[in-house]
Amino acid sequence: MKTIAGLSWISALSSLASLPNGLGVSAQNNTPSTWPLHDNGLSDVVQWDHYSFKVNGKRLFVFSGEIHYWRIPVYEVWEDLLEKIKAAGFTAFAFYGNWAYHSANNKTLDFESGAHDFSKLFEIAHRVGLYVITRPGPYVNAEANAGGFPLWLTTGAYGKLRDDDPRYLQALDPYFSKFSELTSKHLVTNGGNALVYQIENEYGEQWKDRTKKIPNDAAGRYMQALEDSARANGIEIPLIHNDPNMNTKSWSKDYAPGAVGNVDVAGLDSYPSCWSCNLAECTGTNGKYVAYQVVNYYDHFKEVSPTQPSFFPEFQGGSYNPWGGPEGGCPGDIGADFANLFYRNLISQRVTAVSLYMMFGGTNWGAIAAPVTATSYDYSSPISENREIGAKFYETKNLAMFTRVADDLTVTDRLGSSSSYTTNPAVTASELRNPITKAAFYVTIHSVSSSSTTESFKLHISTSVGNLTIPQHSGSIVLNGHQSKIISTDFAMGNKTLTYSTAEILTYALIDSSPVVVLSTDVGGSVEFHVKGATKGSLASSGFTSNATFRAEAGGVTTNIERVTGMGVYQFNNGVKVVLADKPTAYLFWAPNLSNDPFAPVDQSVLIQGPYLVRGAALDGDVVALKGDVKNSTTIEVFAHETALTLSWNGKKLETSRTPYGSLKAQISAFNGTIPLPSLNDWKVNEGLPEKMPEYDDNGAAWVVANHTTTPNPTKPDTLPVLYVDEYGFHNSFHLFRGYFEGSATGAQLSVQGGLAFGWSAWLNGDLVGSWLGNTTLGVGNMTLSFANATVHANGTNVLLIAQDNTGHDLRGGATDPRGILRATLDGADFTSWKIAGEAGGENIQLDPVRGPLAEGGLTAERLGWHLSGFSDCDWASASPSTGFSGADIKFYRTTFPLDIPEDVDASFAFILNATGPKTVRVQLFVNGYQYARFNPYVGNEVKFPIPPGILNYAGDNVIGLSVWAQGNDGAKVDVEFVQEYAVESSWSSRFDSEYLRPEWTEERLAYA
């Protein structure tokens, strides 16, 4: 082995003294003892310092990802998601609460019905083995309706929101207290898995003037009130917060010692490639968009939170797709390459706690969404909306698996970052070194991070056997396009050491006390690694096109492989086993743990290659019992304890053989059956807008007289009465306004507000007089209507009906922006009265607590329950939405079909909608009572709508409803297709008893005609 003395090419290290054990450079003077070790004064179970979090005295690399239980309201599916997150090597997951989902009115909280019982997340987390980052709000943003505020809060009657206004604090107290109380039963301090608890969300309001550090006292009192409430309701774990960007610098005890409202650990949110597919939304925060341009966070954390871990409660996991965005989202610059480059870049900046937003996005079903986004909340996440995993998941997994076993990564100092570490100025490396063990991690990246060139280089490193330039003997390290690589040195594997490897470390396990380490590199790449303490090495198995060369040198064995394809196994006489895999092979490498410890102890891990997904492993005598998913029949190879003789897969024993190097092999078969899909032919139809006719009777329970002449809303209407729907207890989606006037009028002026992409139509005495078709950049639709082509009763009563499609309440300070009519005037007459209808029962009567307060709007079909099973459509006419109808109207179509999905299969299905007639239509798709699609082709491009199991009945009948609103007189035609997304043989069966999620129609609906 060649060594190089006097590393003149690392100027940052030139003045550092020699270290023990032959290391040529020293870490900076900082050591863990230099930095204060913090706890919150209530418990020392969770501690933290400059380097990382500690749990029960052990340092933890927090690799987490966000899911939203309220965007996937089926708790059986939560287990599928958390098993996938665990399988990806994560140590934690995060979730937001949603106050609106739990609170229909200011007297009601529901944490029990259906998926409202979020405590099941903690139970699954404990079983699977994940810590939990709990984020209750009360405001969460999340592109959710009103940012997660309950919609009854948006009227203005509760004062200034997100402030210390006593009306607001009193309103939030029941929710926040109960959420804290329920979480307190699952804290890591009492044997649960809740690790930290977030106060508010992206509330960077600590300063009136940050440069002068003039505090915003009201914001401080608000934060302190939330913190006091959390503590009073049993939250003993650390309190955290997430700054929205690097400018606000709020709530850190390091930055503002002693300030009111500070939290225990301050974090930062960042979306360097934009949180939206519309890049223009981010230029104000991020500046001009440059694909793959990384951001300097290192200096921010040094300034704002130097005695705390560098922590991202949110780091970009994808982007949401706004109205008008591309079908399927925008994965182009935020796919697998993004995950590779940006997440390793965080490592280079000493980040030891990160949660990806989102890991699984889910769906904006019902009225979940804010106006900024449509039905899909796929977010281009590692786990797709239909729960499928692919390259981005695998790329993220490969890094997370490494961080879970790289104990030395939790205590590092950054010694330098420059191109001087490499032999190619186009490549920069950052050196992180553990000041105790002297292990190091060199994170390599293009010097211009946005570069997509292929660059070969060698790397100057400092190790326990001297200063080296690697690879020493042949080949080079290569960055292929948008790529970063972490080169580890003096990597501890139990009591053995991998001195260095030019391939990345994927994971390792101690099998019968001996390390098996898995390395990964690009297909066709060359690799060099040095195993310390060995004197001989041998090739045990190889699918490679070139053989290995072994050299005994410098207290170990250096191994060179010229070209890597597939997987090879190398054995060394000190007990170390090295598995070398190319990237596609490494994508299908797994390390399930035999315990449910989130730390995943390496002596209880099993290493597995082959399947699409491995969800878990257990030892049952001499059987390694594996569970997971398989897409294609494949060979499975397992590195497990020598007492294991046989493999089983999803409960079935496999014909197993042992390789000469000790692993177990078997064949597993995939699901090769077919799932017959129903034809959607037998539709029935009914009139969906009887309210447009003047003879319609609006004296029933569905209607409220709109007679308010004042409003607490800060936005005052231009005309009276007040026609804001929230004033009258209606909040969701579809609303109706009936305005009466006597005698002649020639037209009307209307200003209607409903959020971005919303629409409205107006009928006079049953005749269409105008439609606002929607605009992706406007939340207000102003129109002058002419009555020239309508029937006006000059000597009688006239009725103007306005149907409004509300796309949700705005975010942040816009939550109180009203929904409804801002101005309504007539030419030649005056309105004499108004009535408003919305969801059946309004906010005060909950007809469907299981689906919850955001499930329905005010369509006739919704109020009367036509979308529910148990409703009889026997007297409806037969007609298909693909045939359609003429004229401006709303029709409701209904059909039923069965599904019979096999046991032990995870299958996913979606509906595809296509407007074959005019695009000026607004369509809602209902599946077993859940609105799971808003299809608005005039303003949006989304056409495919995945439906999760549980919402779909996989073992029986499914009721499908389709509301079709033609906004023009040329009518509408809509094709509906039901497709299979995938079907895999799985230990997690998508067929389960979900009847509890689908309460049926009841007669009380009849009152809301």
From Swiss-Prot:
The keyword Disulfide bond applies. Keywords: Carbohydrate metabolism, Disulfide bond, Glycoprotein, Glycosidase, Hydrolase, Polysaccharide degradation, Secreted, Signal. GO terms for molecular function: beta-galactosidase activity. The active site is at E202, E314. Residues 1-27 form the signal peptide. It is an enzyme of class 3 (hydrolase). It is found in: Secreted. Its main location: secreted. It holds the Pfam family Glyco_hydro_35. Substrate binds at Y96, N141, A142, E143, N201, Y271, Y379. One of its GO terms (biological process) is polysaccharide catabolic process. It catalyses: Hydrolysis of terminal non-reducing beta-D-galactose residues in beta-D-galactosides. Disulfide bonds join C277-C330. Its EC number is 3.2.1.23. It comes from the Eukaryota. Transmembrane segments: none annotated. Glycans are attached at N106, N467, N495, N547, N593, N632, N672, N707, N775, N782, N789, N795, N914. GO terms for cellular component: extracellular region. Cleaves beta-linked terminal galactosyl residues from gangliosides, glycoproteins, and glycosaminoglycans. Belongs to the glycosyl hydrolase 35 family. This is Probable beta-galactosidase B. It comes from Pyrenophora tritici-repentis (strain Pt-1C-BFP).
